[in-house]
């Protein structure tokens, strides 16, 4: 049947990370090319203690630009107080001006000799030479004062030329509700 006076309603389903990108709250970034120089490397997505947001990790990549395989160990609940903050981070919605600034930071250290002493090693991977390991799914939420650390070169020889670690995440404000005494 045809109803000329009725409007057709439409519903469009989009992935939640795309929704966050549309709002200007999805960020992506990477470390520069990191060289171990007979040391191990730490790369991390860090949520500063005063951020007032949760970071929802959507993607982690480890790109091994080397002739040798590389080990990557992933830690939660570990602290990284030191490190260089990467400036290669951007909001993924290029239409928002001024560009939103993320609370989360990508940090890295190239002079470590052992894995994080605190925290939990949640999984490990081998990254083949001249390849990229991609981990996606959005199951990790980093609250203020926490981080996700990638420790490189832990259980394979410390001979790798270049590696790049990248993170994709969105940020959601933590709302504090006043206590209700009803």
Feature annotation, model-predicted:
Residues 1-182:
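Beta-strand-centric surfaces of beta-sandwich/beta-rich domains
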């Amino acid at each position: 049947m045809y109803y000329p006076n009725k409007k057709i309603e439409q519903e469009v389903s989009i992935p939640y990370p795309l929704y966050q990108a549309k709002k200007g709250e999805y960020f992506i970034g990477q470390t520069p090319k990191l060289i171990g120089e007979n040391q191990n490397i730490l790369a991390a997505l860090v949520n500063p203690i005063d951020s007032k947001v949760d970071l929802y990790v959507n993607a982690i990549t480890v790109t091994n630009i080397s002739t040798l395989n590389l080990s990557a160990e992933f830690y939660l609940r570990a602290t990284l107080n030191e490190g260089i903050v990467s400036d290669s981070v951007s909001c993924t919605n290029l239409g928002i001006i001024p560009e939103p600034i993320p609370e989360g930071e990508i940090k890295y250290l190239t002079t470590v000799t052992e894995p994080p002493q605190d925290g939990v090693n949640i999984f490990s991977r081998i990254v083949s030479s001249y390849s990229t390991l991609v981990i996606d799914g959005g199951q990790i939420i980093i609250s203020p004062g926490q981080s996700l650390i990638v420790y490189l070169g832990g259980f394979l020889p410390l001979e790798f030329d270049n590696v790049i670690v990248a993170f994709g995440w969105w940020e959601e404000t933590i709302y504090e509700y006043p206590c209700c005494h009803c």
